[in-house]
Amino acid sequence: MSFKFNEESFLDNSFNETLREKLTKMLNSRKSMDIKIDDHLSYANNRGSTSCSNNFDNSSSIKARDSKLDILKSDVKVCEVNFPTIPNLEILDLDVSGQPRALAKGICKISCRDALLQIQTEIEANSLLLYTNISPDFTTPLMIANDTFTIPITMTFSQIQLEAITNVFVKNSGVGISFNDVSLDFQFDCSIKLLQPHIAKRLRKSMQLVFKDVLPSALFNMSRSWFTHDGSSSQTTTDHSQEEGSRLIRLHRLTVEDLDLQDLSPVNMLKLSTLTSSRQTLSLHSTMPKYFSTIPGCLDRQNFRNFTSRMPCLSNYGGGSDDGDKHVPHIHNLQNKNLLPEEALEENDIDLKAILSIQTKIYERGISTNNDVIRPRRRKIRIKRAKKSIVNKATETSSNLNADSEITPVSSSHNATSSVNTITSLTTSSLGSTAGSSNSKNTNRSSSFTSSIMPITPLAQSSMNKKDGNLITLRQDSKVLDSMKYFTKIQDLHNIHASFNSSRETQDSNNRFRIASEMLPTKREISPIPTLNSFIEPNRRFSFVGLNHKTSHDNSWSVDEQPPPYY
């Protein structure tokens, strides 16, 4: 079953005006009720019917009337309501019974299109002021600049599309409607574009409250005039508002004196007493370096600077005097390092015990609550030893050899034999290491051969420098002058060597000229003979000592050819 509304009622602007007034009244009904309650409380307080507890009730009633933040600073005013398309109402089910409480009940479907609604109000832009209004006085800080800042705002809802399934109850006093299934869509426009997304999001979330509370109460109050006369309906509305206001007043007038203390929870009372006394228990005590006391609990933000300025630190140290004001700096920076001030160092007024106590307390504060010992950080210096390269080793070896082979001046008064033996041993060791880098085969063969050769005895010679007449400089003995080198250098000596090999069998019985053939090198194995200049280092002096060996026939050898050694 369905029917249509009369078009003439919608074409006339009277319906829109009536609906606008009703919506304005219902949107401000909650705030008007709070104002009435505040008026009754102020009137009762002026009469003196209550004690000082009423003052607390009067101040807290405004702050505690709603736990949520209220950003509205003025009444909500509905500026325009328009229905360009006539709404449609369809009755899906209807039940008429003779019960005294309800004349009829049914299920209806309401559809509305292209509706327009425009409202205006003022909001509070200072959100800090909103928090201070609802917070208790003993926890609210004192703000220097906490003035109100109101901004007018206009919100327009256009292209409203509404489809809803409702349950209708017709009673003796009015019509009650409950919305079960609601489909709502609209376009929102705000004068403050910065707040438009936030307000639109909150409005879409609050639509459920509108259809469950605001609209049913508005329709019920409007329908009460249909069933009763005008005078009686106004009187009934006034009585109802007065009864509700008096009930709320009685609730707010409730004090501790009117209640039995046994009904109060001791746990809640203990929490309240602890909360109120916490303001007086947060004392800093003495924060001097000698009388430092840690605060395990919380600390006020306004006293935090005083606390940090009196923290034990070497930068706050002023010397070893007992004056407490000397330890407190006038200006303290949290970024100051733990260093002694210049004044203490200049005046040489340093107390080692006070410095030790400060460092100990700073270390103890770094220990965690689980008694985990935190070891202090120590500076560690690690020295990495550089690995000696091969070049450095070779340099050191050559320097050691040069130091060992350095010729020292010998006095003439010393024993000539001991000096000659000493110089010979040094020369043999130095040249032996140099000659070791040659071919290993030649070295092995020459070693066994030179063991049977009589050593060459160098002769002392006077110094060439007249100024150093007391010094005797001897030429070093060298392995270059071995008989092995002489045989391989000169062709005639090589022939003599071959003749020795040919007559080896005939002279085997005498065993005089027995020379192992493998001890002498062949022509292919002959290596170039190093010259004496290759062994001479710069800034060294060498004196030449010739060989003075002669044969039995007094035939001396020439300078170019050295005679072979005798056996």
From Swiss-Prot:
GO MF annotation: an example: lipid binding
PROSITE patterns: SMP (PS51847)
Membrane-topology descriptor: Multi-pass membrane protein
Record keyword rRNA-binding present: no
Taxonomic superkingdom: Eukaryota
GO cellular component annotations of the record: ERMES complex
Region feature Disordered, mapped onto this chain: 392-453
Domain SMP-LTD: 1-224
Keywords, sorted A to Z: Lipid transport, Lipid-binding, Membrane, Mitochondrion, Mitochondrion outer membrane, Transmembrane, Transmembrane beta strand, Transport
GO BP annotations listed: mitochondrial genome maintenance; mitochondrion-endoplasmic reticulum membrane tethering; phospholipid transport
Localization per record: Mitochondrion outer membrane
Compositionally biased region (Low complexity): 417-452
Polar residues compositional bias, start-end: 392-416
Keyword field contains Transport: yes
Function: Component of the ERMES/MDM complex, which serves as a molecular tether to connect the endoplasmic reticulum (ER) and mitochondria. Components of this complex are involved in the control of mitochondrial shape and protein biogenesis, and function in nonvesicular lipid trafficking between the ER and mitochondria. MDM34 is required for the interaction of the ER-resident membrane protein MMM1 and the outer mitochondrial membrane-resident beta-barrel protein MDM10.
Comment on protein domains: Lacks alpha-helical transmembrane segments, suggesting that it resides in the membrane via beta-sheet conformations similar to those predicted for other outer membrane proteins and porin. The SMP-LTD domain is a barrel-like domain that can bind various types of glycerophospholipids in its interior and mediate their transfer between two adjacent bilayers.
Family of this protein: Belongs to the MDM34 family.
Record-linked PANTHER family: MITOCHONDRIAL DISTRIBUTION AND MORPHOLOGY PROTEIN 34
Subunit structure: Component of the ER-mitochondria encounter structure (ERMES) or MDM complex, composed of MMM1, MDM10, MDM12 and MDM34.
Name of protein: Mitochondrial distribution and morphology protein 34
